[in-house]
């Protein structure tokens, strides 16, 4: 469980989000939405522990879990001489001995991850040969094989086509059904309404947080 006690996200002393109070329950699935520049990605980085809160408190109960993280802008350079399988296997590194290498179970997990995103046939291709959509699928497979209890996704569908977006969305739903907690920054209101039970909507002054349907209804009323 993640508890936000008057949490304000931002950079240094510059507050970007309003103060947030609430709880993200273990096993929940939450979309963070709002206009560009309202602090969605900043909040997600704060929840992940990459940024300290400007003010307020972030509490983990019972303790901070391992996080599967998919950034909006990846830091992995496609010029590196890595294969698709190399990158996906990085998700298993926390559970792998440096001296023993990848055991059968880990190799099976990597193969499953590649299969789930439709990249099994490209496992040994170097990453500089991938299209943008294939690259995003590879990074998502890395998160999937990690099997972290908490998964944070920052704009996972940016720059990819509809078919790839839906493929990844189906994998996110499966991860949630398996008991993983999902927090995702999204712009796609249709997918939020269809798949995410809980929504946190940010704007410059206030936040709406709760079941997706009521939050969406309030937003439509404000826009009318």
What are these regions (language model features)?
Residues 48:
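Helix-to-loop junction immediately C-terminal to a conserved catalytic motif
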Residues 162-164:
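Helix N-cap at the start of a conserved alpha-helix in ABC-type nucleotide-binding domains
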Residues 126-130:
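Conserved ABC ATPase signature
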Residues 104-122:
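Conserved ABC ATPase "signature" region
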Residues 195-213:
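H-loop (His-switch) and adjacent beta-strand-loop-beta switch element
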Residues 151-155:
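Catalytic Walker B motif of ABC-type/P-loop ATPase nucleotide-binding domains
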Residues 186-187:
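H-loop/switch region of ABC-family ATPase nucleotide-binding domains
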């Amino acid at each position: 469980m993640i508890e936000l006690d008057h949490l304000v996200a931002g950079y240094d002393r510059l507050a970007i989000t309003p103060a947030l109070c609430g709880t993200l329950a273990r096993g929940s699935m939450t979309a963070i939405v709002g206009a560009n520049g309202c602090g969605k990605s900043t909040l997600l980085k704060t929840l992940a522990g990459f940024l300290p809160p400007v003010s307020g408190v972030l509490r983990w109960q019972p303790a901070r879990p391992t996080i599967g993280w998919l950034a909006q802008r990846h830091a992995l350079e496609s010029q590196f001489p890595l294969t698709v399988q190399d990158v996906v296997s990085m998700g298993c590194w926390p559970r792998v001995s440096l001296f023993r290498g990848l055991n059968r179970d880990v190799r099976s997990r990597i193969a499953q991850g590649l299969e789930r995103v439709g990249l099994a046939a490209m496992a040994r291709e170097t990453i500089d040969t991938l299209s943008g959509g294939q690259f995003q699928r590879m990074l998502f497979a890395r998160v999937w094989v990690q099997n972290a209890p908490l998964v944070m996704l920052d704009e996972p569908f940016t720059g990819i086509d509809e078919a790839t977006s839906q493929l990844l969305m189906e994998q996110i739903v499966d991860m949630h059904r398996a008991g993983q907690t999902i927090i995702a920054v999204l712009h796609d209101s249709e997918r939020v309404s269809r798949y995410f039970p809980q929504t946190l909507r940010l704007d410059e002054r206030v936040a709406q947080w709760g079941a997706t349907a009521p939050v969406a209804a309030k937003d439509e009323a404000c826009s009318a």
